[in-house]
Each structure stands twice: as C-alpha cells, then as structure tokens.
Amino acid sequence: MKFNNILIFSDIDGTLISHKNQELEGVSDFLNKVIKSFHLVLNSSKTYFEINKFVEHYDINMPFIAENGSAIYFPKNGLFSSYPKNCKHNDEYFFLQLGFDKSKIESFIKMNLLKRFVSDCQFLHEMEIEKVMLYTGLNFENSKISQNRQFSLPFLWTGSEKQIKEFKKKVIQFDLSIIYGGKFYHLIGGSNKGNALLHLKNYYSKIFKVEPMTIAIGDSENDLEMLLKADLSGVIKNKATKKIKINKTENVFYSNKEAPLGWKEVLLMMDPIKNSLIKDN
C-alpha cells in the first residue's frame, strides 16, 4: 500500500463488530475497501493476542494499538523501514510500550489505600472461563485469549456508583486511570487511546514527511480521548451504554445504527472517505 494521508483509528467491540455476536455482518465488503484504500489502525481494549488474530483473519497489515493505548504494534513486514526508539519485538512485530506492565498495576492495587475498592472488583483474568464467556460473548478459545493481559486489568464492578467514582479519583495519584469500555471497567496506567493515536500520528509525520489526517471511531467512554484528539470523530450508537459526550463542536458524526452497520454509516458521512471511495470506483 502506498502512503496516503488518512489514518483511521477504530475501536473493535461495539464499533467495528457487534457486542452481541462479535460479527461483521453486512460490512465485510466495505471493510475490505477501507483496508485497501486507507490506513486502518485498530485501537482497542483487546489484547495483542486478540487483535493479532483479528488482523490476520482480515489481512490488515497495519500497526495496531492494544489494551487501551498501552502499546503500539508495528508489523515487521509492513510500511516502515525503521521503528521508534525503545521498541521491543517478538517474532512478528516491533512494539512500543506506552502503558504500565500488568505487574506494576497489580502492585498498586495491593496497597492498603486501594484494598477496600479492590474487594468490589471481579477481575477478568481471575474469572472462571464460563463467566468470561457469559459476559464477553466470546467462545471458549477467545475467552481464554482475552484473559492473557500484559498492560491492563479489566474488571466487573459490584460496588456502588459513588464508590467507583471515589476509586477513580484515588488511582489518579499513581498515574492510573479507570475507564469504562462498554462491558468492563479497565484499570490502566501511563497512557490511553488518545495518547497512542498522537504517538502514531507523529511517527507517520516523521517517516512520510506529511501530517496525516486522523479519523477516530468509537462507542464507549474508553474511546473518548481518541475521539477528542482526532481531526474527524465518529461515534457509534450503542444502546447498552450512555451516549458519549464529546467536547467538540465540529467534525463529529453520530451513527443512527449500531455496530457493525453504524461503522460503515459514520465513515460514509465523512467527505474524505466518501469522496475517495467514489473516486476509486
């Protein structure tokens, strides 16, 4: 793929695929057009292992961002001939870690100051697999993969609304944050989806000597920073969560449909996408 100046940062669950059945029904052909025409960067709360499986299935040979902005993964056979400093690597990817290690986050929640809140958390990685399947809608194999966290601690909250607000305030002093992702709360540290978007945007500018236009698409609270920092923002309707309130007056587009059809709908509201696809056809 030749470089063009549009980067599309997209959440996955509830945005690109349905929360209900994890399917892409009705948008597969459109997704393929987007993959061939633009730079689609998945920016999700999902793990490296989950997203890697997804991009392999749909042949998306682009960087992606895992665990709510905690790490950016660059395919070794992708666009870049060089990679950011401080990158680590595995067999298939170079990756830039932006967030805290899971072990560091775990060390904070063992502190006496936070223990009373932790007692109301049901952490994803500690759940019985049947419960993970029930709450995520994933099959057995994918549920096991979702528990293999490197940089975050998703959890179900059993306490009150007042207590979770207090918990959110308490963790800030440790450079941690708690964000809601549609089904689970996520305890993360050191980064978020918006910061990761800016890191990757700036690296594209450095490598290709042009500042790319950024588009962000999401449906939940954990997408808010990404939506705020993008040039164009697409919000996908999600009946299961509160409507995201974005402090932007321009270039915000709201779908009338839920995922996955809402993903196609909101992208086609944006002139740079619509005009480019019409020209290519």
Model-derived features: where do they sit?
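Conserved acidic, metal-coordinating active-site core of Asp-based
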Residues: 112-215, 221
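Phosphate- and divalent-cation-binding pockets in alpha/beta enzyme and binding domains
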Residues: 26, 50-53, 131, 196, ...
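Short, acidic loop-to-helix structural element flanking the phosphoryl-transfer center
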Residues: 20-38, 102, 163-165, 190-203
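Short hydrophobic/aromatic-enriched beta-strand-loop microsegments
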Residues: 61-67, 141-143, 233-238
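Mg2+-dependent phosphoryl-transfer enzymes with acidic/Ser/Thr/Gly-rich catalytic loops
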Residues: 2-4, 24, 184-281
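Asp-based phosphoryl-transfer active-site loop
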Residues: 4-21, 227
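Active-site phosphate-binding/coordination module
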Residues: 23-123
